[in-house]
């Protein structure tokens, strides 16, 4: 895809910033198809376990809340002003899955070494077939375009490592995650299997009441306890697990004595929750701080706030 064509797509997607929230951006089907194909090539040119450097801003679930995504960028700085890592779940549930995924893919194509997207459990055909994305593609374009997105999603990387100290994924740990090389060796393109390493990385959840591994109420994957987190970090000489996948009231929530953090970046999720959204800024000393999008009393308006500084696990100088 020509750089000028990508710039044009980004420009039109950002034009709605000053419009009423929810205004659709009508890109041509051919443009979206090219965007998917180009992004797919970029994903495949980079490893399944991304190795990234701080400073970087990390965001959790977006779920088609395009207006909130634009506010996150207004707050954290539009690319390439800041480096970004998103932890998956770009589509489904919210009203603007298409605008959301197109802007994220366009930024990935435009800034391949500064802007990173991981795979969430909703970047999977069997899930987004049910929870909204398929219907949106079918209504606004056609099923063929949905299949093009599926092919693109099947190439998304699973995990990222920030300065060899912070491991990031959408869901969580896996009993099959014996070494980080196991992530590097997951084949792509691939669908998300019902069990196994990739499934767990996208689906598992921490649970303070579990020792080791437990059953997951989602009916998929496992839950893992604080002991599992501690053991994993010690074994791999890591400081922090950063994941998304669960709505948390303040936009971020620590677990296992600050050895794991859950990030969620869709405030007022689905219009049903009163949660804040957060992004985590990791500076070049690996100090983590949180920027908060608070839900406001009046729907559609968001307040900005800033969280206290918090070191990951133990304060670590950058290596």
From Swiss-Prot:
Its cofactor is Mn(2+). InterPro entries: Calcineurin-like_PHP_ApaH (IPR004843), Metallo-depent_PP-like (IPR029052), PP1_catalytic_subunit (IPR050341), Ser/Thr-sp_prot-phosphatase (IPR006186), STPPase_N (IPR031675). Keywords: Hydrolase, Manganese, Metal-binding, Protein phosphatase. Mn(2+) 2 binds at residues 89, 121, 170, 245. Its EC number is 3.1.3.16. Binds 2 manganese ions per subunit. It is an enzyme of class 3 (hydrolase). The active site is at residue 122. Mn(2+) 1 binds at residues 61, 63, 89. The keyword RNA-binding does not apply. The keyword NADP does not apply. One of its GO terms (molecular function) is metal ion binding. It catalyses: O-phospho-L-seryl-[protein] + H2O = L-seryl-[protein] + phosphate; O-phospho-L-threonyl-[protein] + H2O = L-threonyl-[protein] + phosphate. GO terms for cellular component: cytoplasm; nucleus. Transmembrane segments: none annotated. Belongs to the PPP phosphatase family. PP-1 subfamily. This is Serine/threonine-protein phosphatase PP1 isozyme 2. It comes from Acetabularia peniculus (Green alga).
